[in-house]
């Protein structure tokens, strides 16, 4: 790569929600952009941590025993194996950092499972 990645331009290239798009790879990790609103499904990633960096809006990461609000400019690391779901009252844009091949719905599957290899 010989140029910087403009995240605003990348976010403008898609409108679908709950469908992360890969923008870069570092070693075995993907950097993904995602847009979402509403509630996601309860799930876990048994073999990897998951990082959310909020670029615009606000989100909540729900665990069975507590919630973590995450605002624009903040990040949160979800420990591997922790059952969680995300939600946003209004559209939220975030960057995910996770091991390449990580499925967005983890062990839950279902109709919100996105292709894991979509680059923009």
Model-derived features with residue positions:
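A cytosolic small-molecule/anion-sensing beta-strand core signal
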Residues: 27, 55-56, 71-72, 90
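Short beta-strand His + acidic residue motifs that chelate non-heme Fe in jelly-roll/DSBH
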Residues: 43, 61-62, 78, 83-89, ...
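Double-stranded beta-helix
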Residues: 3-11, 24, 85, 89-120
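Glycine- and acidic-residue-biased ligand/ion/polar-headgroup-sensing regions
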Residues: 36-38, 47-60, 64-65
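Short acidic-glycine-tyrosine-enriched beta hairpin
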Residues: 64-80
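A short glycine-rich, His/Asp/Glu-containing loop-to-beta-strand
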Residues: 7-42, 48, 97
């Amino acid at each position: 790569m010989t140029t910087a990645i403009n995240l605003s331009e990348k976010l403008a290239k898609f409108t679908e929600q709950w469908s992360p798009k890969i923008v870069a790879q570092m070693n075995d990790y993907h950097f993904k952009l995602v847009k979402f609103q509403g509630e996601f499904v309860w799930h876990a990633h048994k073999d990897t941590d998951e990082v959310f960096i909020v670029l615009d809006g606000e989100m909540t990461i729900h665990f069975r025993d507590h919630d973590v609000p995450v605002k624009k400019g903040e990040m949160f690391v979800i420990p591997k194996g922790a059952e969680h779901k995300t939600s946003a009252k209004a559209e939220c844009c975030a960057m995910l950092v996770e091991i390449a091949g990580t499925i967005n719905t983890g062990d839950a599957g279902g109709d919100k499972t996105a292709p894991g290899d979509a680059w923009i």
